């Protein structure tokens, strides 16, 4: 019975939290399985601008991809929709992977998660030229 009470209290706390207003920047980190028999890791910096009903902005940073090892620059346009404590997000753009052919690859993902104010935690799935991406993202508002 005690476990159920703690679980109910945790769920009530998460649902009662309200997302924080848009901050100046957002620092994100993600890890994903890429069906091209690789893993993709990113650290990005983004800026979301408030528009009626949603937020839109760029997200650019550093990417590391395994098998074979390659570094690059992900450059995406992000659309973010806050729904209370939850969020839905989509992004699309180009990834520049310098030691792979082709160097410029189309990228698009969508996902969702919990917006806990300064921290957002979520999952995402999508496409990076020649394969699917399935992963998780954590973001910090700065």
Predicted regions located by residue number:
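Cleavable N-terminal export/targeting peptides
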Residues: 1-26
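Short glycine/proline- and aromatic-enriched beta-strand/turn motifs that initiate or cap beta-hairpins
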Residues: 20-72
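Membrane-embedded beta-strand positions of outer-membrane beta-barrel proteins
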Residues: 27-31, 58-60, 75, 88-92, ...
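Outer-membrane beta-barrel "beta-signal"
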Residues: 28, 112-117, 131-142
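Short glycine-rich beta-strand segments
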Residues: 30-34, 61-65, 80-82, 91-99, ...
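Short polar/acidic secondary-structure junctions
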Residues: 34, 48-50, 82, 127-130
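Residues that define the transmembrane beta-barrel architecture of outer-membrane proteins
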Residues: 37-43, 54, 69-75, 86, ...
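Outer-membrane beta-barrel proteins
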Residues: 45-53, 78-85, 116-118, 140-142
